[in-house]
Amino acid sequence: MKTNLLNYDLQGLTRHFADMGEKPFRAKQVMRWMHQSGAQNFNEMTDLAKSLRHKLNEQAGIEIPKLMMSQKSSDGTRKWLLDVGTGNGVETVFIPESDRGTLCISSQVGCALECTFCSTGRQGFNRNLTAAEIIGQLWWANKAMGVTPKNERVISNVVMMGMGEPMANFDNVVTALSIMLDDHGYGLSRRRVTVSTSGMVPQMDRLRDVMPVALAVSLHASNDEVRNQIVPLNKKYPLKELMAACQRYLVKAPRDFITFEYVMLDGINDKAQHARELIELVKDVPCKFNLIPFNPFPNSGYERSSNENIRVFRDILQQAGFVVTVRKTRGDDIDAACGQLAGQVQDKTRRQQKWQQILIGQQG
């Protein structure tokens, strides 16, 4: 089987070329061709010797996930569905803003964490994505979006907030991050690359040490009782441990704050009392809040908080001195909004039926 060079960061690519008896600078050349020029085969790499191109064609390949579908929302949001084999697809979403272009990338096919308000979690878990499948999302989007009239990349920011829990696919995510940050890859700043986690504490500590990019934490609750209910991972790493891990992460983080994401669920976590509990919870963690109006999906069992509840919640946090944003709903018409990245995942665990039975039982 040929080696897919898209799975390698510069360090791995350099080792690969050394094993072939080639000089280290060849790795930099090939990396630039793959990620900066969007080359899909070695014959395009005209500054490589013909003999090396022949050798690479025999031993290696550049295998990018196949594009299954591309959609564009009325608000400019773009979504690509990529084929990762065996009938599975993963989604990546581009969100344009006036001052930046953000790409939201998936790290797994499905998700095993079972956050109760997340449509991806309801699909069950299939497998981790390879580094090539993760970076391939940026490759496709970069090719589609191109550069601005000033010759700047349209994609200026990357957030690992798509399907899956990035920390549960740690090694492949770190390899992909390394390619994103490398000047021979995409040359992104650590400050402009964000990994989101539901709170896998040991992996947060590892990421701080090996690849400290910006960090977002899917918090969604102000106390353990509510978080245990909606983010089951909290039973393993409760809020006290999570807050301590956030403090440790900031020692090496490229930004001096953590972003806490908080989905607003009507009657569950959106009361003034919850906002006041939050203030107490994060008092020792420099942070910003991103409030996310819930995006309803079939059989979710949840409703979006009212605009009034969101406003009151935001005001309480702001009056306590926190920077708070309320996420605008983007890409609703192409199911690209936060929590809707269900993809074309086969529901191997039949969790949809399980949730329907639970809801029927609650209504009876």
UniProtKB/Swiss-Prot annotation:
SUPFAM superfamilies: Radical SAM enzymes (SSF102114). It is an enzyme of class 2 (transferase). It holds the Pfam family Radical_SAM. Disulfide bonds join C104-C338. Residues 97-333 form the Radical SAM core domain. One of its GO terms (molecular function) is tRNA (adenine(37)-C2)-methyltransferase activity. S-adenosyl-L-methionine binds at G164, E165, S196, S218, L219, H220, N295. It catalyses: adenosine(2503) in 23S rRNA + 2 reduced [2Fe-2S]-[ferredoxin] + 2 S-adenosyl-L-methionine = 2-methyladenosine(2503) in 23S rRNA + 5'-deoxyadenosine + L-methionine + 2 oxidized [2Fe-2S]-[ferredoxin] + S-adenosyl-L-homocysteine; adenosine(37) in tRNA + 2 reduced [2Fe-2S]-[ferredoxin] + 2 S-adenosyl-L-methionine = 2-methyladenosine(37) in tRNA + 5'-deoxyadenosine + L-methionine + 2 oxidized [2Fe-2S]-[ferredoxin] + S-adenosyl-L-homocysteine. Keywords: 4Fe-4S, Cytoplasm, Disulfide bond, Iron, Iron-sulfur, Metal-binding, Methyltransferase, rRNA processing, S-adenosyl-L-methionine, Transferase, tRNA processing. [4Fe-4S] cluster binds at C111, C115, C118. The active site is at E91, C338. It comes from the Bacteria. Binds 1 [4Fe-4S] cluster. The cluster is coordinated with 3 cysteines and an exchangeable S-adenosyl-L-methionine. Its EC number is 2.1.1.192. The keyword Iron-sulfur applies. Its cofactor is [4Fe-4S] cluster. One of its GO terms (cellular component) is cytoplasm. One of its GO terms (biological process) is rRNA base methylation. It is found in: Cytoplasm. Reaction proceeds by a ping-pong mechanism involving intermediate methylation of a conserved cysteine residue. Specifically methylates position 2 of adenine 2503 in 23S rRNA and position 2 of adenine 37 in tRNAs. m2A2503 modification seems to play a crucial role in the proofreading step occurring at the peptidyl transferase center and thus would serve to optimize ribosomal fidelity. Belongs to the radical SAM superfamily. RlmN family. PANTHER family: 23S RRNA METHYLTRANSFERASE, RADICAL SAM CORE DOMAIN-CONTAINING PROTEIN. This is Dual-specificity RNA methyltransferase RlmN. The lineage of its organism: Bacteria, Pseudomonadati, Pseudomonadota, Betaproteobacteria, Neisseriales. The gene is rlmN.
